[in-house]
Amino acid sequence: MNKVIFEHAVKNATSIIKEQKSLDWSDDVKSGRVTVREMIGTDDGSREFIEKTTYDLYQGRESVPLVYKQLYTTINDRNLPKTLTEEEFGPVQVVFLEKFEGGEVRFGALGPGVTKTVTLHTYAAGIELTEDMLEWNQTWRMSEVGVAFGEAYNKLLNHLHLTPFIGGTYATTGANIAAQKVAQEGTYEDGGIAQLIAFDTDLPTTLRNAFQVLPRGTKLLINSADRYVLEDAIASSMYADTSPSLVKRKLSASDLIEYDGDTVTVGGKEYTYTGVTSGYVYLIVPKRKFKEYVKHGLRTDSGDGDLSRLILTQIVGRSRRGLLTSIACKQGAIKIDIAA
């Protein structure tokens, strides 16, 4: 099969999924009157085969939600270089002074910032459709291949974007919450230290301590096993006069993001994507300090196979992207021990 760019097929597949419709093999193919080999031997049949394969791929992606999207700002630009620098502006420094006759207005200034380097990486995977699949008209097997391909891509994206939080280094600095807040924020000349908040008396108190250290935090990255205890703690967090506490005003059930991790087994080798450990959660300030740079998303092409291995065609997908993250700052993230 000649190399085919899947752009048109991608548009069709995503449109069908968005409209909650399905795309199945034709009745002729399912009944055996026409084999898949015969189908792809014609121009129209080849196009339908590509559309069906691409649909299965995107159906697989739909089955693995991208849970990180609430946390990151996305920058899509085909002109992104492999390596780029991002300059974070320092604080805006402004002071109001009394204006005397003939005097000048004092203009504000930008404080010193931090320059960071972002490297974009290429992530790729391939699947192969064998001659046996076509000879025996195994349409269900080809659909499984496409779905697994899409699932694997979304699993990778969740892993890449959530690892900076889950795999970050956190410490309990200082003797009290006030000291931890100072350590978390640091300065532009001297970076902060991402904080670990210890369990204190009960869950609402612990969460309240966390908000004192990271006041701008609005999202909790959690293990699914902890959802109900967290929801109960948030719902019951009230002051003596029954008015909602800081915790209840700051959080709702929709602010809890579950990630238990994932595993992918390929050729007998297991790849593990570590999730949030039950008993810990991460309070995060979304967007500002967490950016994903996307040169291009999942690009999928097919090419000639390998006759010596009876591979009819190979389908390769790849994406080029990078991340900029900063957890140790006032707009970053902290880790919270919620287990008594």
Label each residue range with its predicted role:
Residues 113, 204-208, 300:
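Glycine-rich, charged/polar anion/phosphate-binding loops
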Residues 125-129, 219-223, 313-323:
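Short, aliphatic-rich beta-strand segments
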Residues 231-340:
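Sequence/fold signature of self-assembling virion shell proteins
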Residues 169, 176-182, 196-252:
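A contiguous, surface-oriented mixed alpha/beta subdomain in the mid-to-C-terminal portion of proteins
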Residues 1-44, 339-340:
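Intrinsically disordered, low-complexity terminal tails
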Residues 125-210:
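Alpha-helical scaffold segments that mediate packing/assembly in large oligomeric complexes
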Residues 40-123:
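Assembly/oligomerization interface modules of large self-assembling protein complexes
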Residues 104-126, 130-132, 140, 146-153, ...:
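Internal, hydrophobic cores of structured domains that mediate oligomerization or house catalytic pockets
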